[in-house]
């Protein structure tokens, strides 16, 4: 159990101190893809919401 907590703390610390990981810039050659890359993290949320819409369509069987 201690190993899990230490792994989580290591991940959180590395995520907090490497802000360039979250706010990295694409190379110049791929700059035209910036709008697509900005939207990509939201795509899994759409699939999650689609599951609820699908279940509502079949009356939550």
Curated annotation (Swiss-Prot):
Q: Give the way it sits in the membrane.
A: Single-pass membrane protein
Membrane spanning residue stretches: 40-60
Recorded family membership:
Belongs to the PsbK family.
User: Where's it found, cell-wise?
Assistant: Plastid, Chloroplast thylakoid membrane
- What processes does the entry annotate via GO biological process terms? photosynthesis
Q: Which gene encodes it?
A: psbK
HAMAP family given in the database record: PSII_PsbK
Quote a single Gene Ontology cellular component term. Answer: photosystem II reaction center
Stated role:
One of the components of the core complex of photosystem II (PSII). PSII is a light-driven water:plastoquinone oxidoreductase that uses light energy to abstract electrons from H(2)O, generating O(2) and a proton gradient subsequently used for ATP formation. It consists of a core antenna complex that captures photons, and an electron transfer chain that converts photonic excitation into a charge separation.
Alphabetical keyword list: Chloroplast, Membrane, Photosynthesis, Photosystem II, Plastid, Reaction center, Thylakoid, Transmembrane, Transmembrane helix
- What is the protein's quaternary organization? PSII is composed of 1 copy each of membrane proteins PsbA, PsbB, PsbC, PsbD, PsbE, PsbF, PsbH, PsbI, PsbJ, PsbK, PsbL, PsbM, PsbT, PsbX, PsbY, PsbZ, Psb30/Ycf12, at least 3 peripheral proteins of the oxygen-evolving complex and a large number of cofactors. It forms dimeric complexes.
Q: Looking at the record's lineage, which domain of life comes first?
A: Eukaryota
The identity of this protein, by name, is Photosystem II reaction center protein K
The record, for InterPro entries, names:
PSII_PsbK (IPR003687), PSII_PsbK_sf (IPR037270)
UniProt-listed SUPFAM superfamilies = Photosystem II reaction center protein K, PsbK
Propeptide span(s): 1-24
Where are the coiled-coil regions?
Answer: none
